[in-house]
């Protein structure tokens, strides 16, 4: 039985990989691009995936979350976001300490935020030179949104606009709200052992990595990440796992590191986590020079929605919008993901109408839950 299951797994994995490579070959032969590159950023060889139907389209760089977790929006996302890649040349990056980059450099996890930011600036310079453009779009997800907003603040002349997905604003404040919510959640559902564990751990902040890891383990047993519908999670986590296991650019060891190994080691050994815990965009960034757009789940208890709204209300920007998704928590539901990608595509099309397609029946205005001018 074990041999049958193992054999079936490898057959399915090979079929998925062949499908992705076939689509990549088609793009590469019809004026587009789909490939993985090794680039030297800082002192380290790192990995990016580039995909798009037309290389004349604007460049969009994704900054994944974690820290140390390149899912979603690392190189395993190749062939996954066709709504975006039809309109942009999309770049996915496995950052220092994450995914394939971690697998190639497993001993180098004692890095700092400053190193990751320097890597990002080098990568943006590389992309601008490679595609002969002055500016690119930047898309930050979860912890990657801290890096994204700081880049917006520091190098606005190199960016068209910024999209913050599940935007981090003030981790300490969000974590304190999250702690209280977890207590209420576990008490109301009768999980008394988890209530006891939380109280024993105490309220954040957690200075020790071991305490933060314990809090994360407790958090993983809650509904803070995912909104549930009719007793089922409203996020296809299995699809994310399949995406990594089927990725033709990852060995099985690299797939394991992408899903588990890299984030675990990064949390234990790098300074990155403690540095991110000290972020306070409320005080740090009060004005930006480019348009900024944010999308968040209405039930995101990891990154406080009310905190995001308060910050954006005060933020000075040429244009700013907040899209609140009714069917999502920190992770976006399948239907809300589709809304986000169409929203991003429509906003980019306003600046690059040459790539615009026939409009959908649903307009951007109809899907905005909240609009801030």
Locate each region found by the language model.
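Conserved hydrolase catalytic core segment
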Residues: 134-176
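Short beta-strand/loop motif that positions the catalytic acidic residue
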Residues: 288, 294-296, 300
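Conserved alpha/beta-hydrolase
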Residues: 84-102
């Amino acid at each position: 039985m074990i041999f049958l299951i193992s054999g079936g797994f490898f057959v399915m994995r090979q079929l998925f990989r062949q499908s992705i490579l076939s689509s990549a070959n088609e793009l590469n032969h019809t004026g587009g691009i789909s490939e993985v590159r090794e680039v030297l950023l800082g002192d380290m060889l790192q990995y990016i995936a580039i995909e798009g139907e037309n290389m004349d389209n604007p460049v969009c760089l994704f900054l994944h979350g974690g820290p140390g977790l390149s899912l979603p929006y690392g190189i395993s996302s190749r062939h996954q976001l066709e709504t975006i890649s039809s309109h942009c040349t999309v770049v996915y990056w496995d950052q220092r300490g994450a995914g394939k980059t971690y697998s190639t450099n497993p001993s180098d996890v004692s890095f700092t935020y400053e190193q990751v930011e320097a890597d990002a600036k080098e990568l943006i310079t590389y992309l601008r030179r490679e595609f002969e453009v002055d500016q690119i779009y930047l898309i930050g997800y979860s912890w990657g949104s801290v890096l994204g907003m700081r880049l917006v603040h520091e190098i606005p002349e190199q960016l068209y606009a910024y999209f913050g997905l599940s935007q981090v604003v003030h981790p300490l404040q969000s974590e304190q709200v999250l702690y209280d919510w977890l207590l209420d959640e576990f008490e109301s559902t009768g999980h008394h052992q988890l209530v006891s564990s939380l109280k024993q751990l105490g309220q954040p902040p957690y200075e020790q990595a071991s305490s933060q890891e314990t809090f994360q383990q407790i958090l993983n047993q809650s509904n803070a990440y995912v909104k549930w519908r009719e007793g089922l999670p409203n996020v296809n986590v299995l699809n994310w796992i399949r995406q990594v296991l089927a990725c033709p650019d990852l060995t099985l060891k690299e797939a394991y590191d992408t899903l588990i190994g890299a984030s675990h080691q990064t949390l234990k050994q790098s300074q990155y986590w403690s540095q991110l815990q000290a972020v306070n965009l409320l005080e740090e960034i009060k004005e930006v020079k480019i348009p900024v757009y944010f999308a968040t789940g209405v039930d995101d208890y990891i990154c406080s929605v009310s905190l995001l709204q308060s910050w954006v209300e005060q933020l000075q920007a040429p244009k700013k919008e907040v899209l609140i998704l009714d069917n999502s928590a920190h992770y976006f539901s399948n239907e809300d993901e589709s809304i986000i990608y169409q929203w991003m595509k429509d906003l980019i099309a306003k600046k690059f109408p040459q790539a615009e397609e026939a409009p959908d029946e649903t307009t951007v205005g109809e899907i905005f839950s909240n609009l801030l001018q």
